[in-house]
Amino acid sequence: MSYYRDMGNKYAQVPDIIIDFHGYTTFECQEAIDALIQEGGYKHIRMIIGRGKRSANGPVLPDFVKSYLTSQNIRFNQSKIQDGGEGSLEVFLK
C-alpha cells in the first residue's frame, strides 16, 4: 500500500495518512480501506483515487470508492484543488 504520513504543523488541517490508489483494483481498494478502518487510529485520511481519464473503459475507482465509503456510512468529501481536487477524497472516521 502506498501511503505517506504528514508530520507538519499540528494546527493545519492535514490528514493523518495519505493513500494513493493509482494502479489498484477495486478489490485491492476495498481491502485497503477495510484494513485502515480495522487498524484504527486515523480520523482524517486523504485517498488519492485519480479521475480515470486514462482508463480504457472510463473511470472505475472514483465511483467504486465513493460508493463503498457511502455503503459503510463513512463521511467524505472531495479534496480542495490544491490537495488533489476531483481525483482525491478527504475521508473522516469517527
Task: Please tell me what each predicted stretch does.
Residues 1-94:
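Long, charged, low-complexity intrinsically disordered regions
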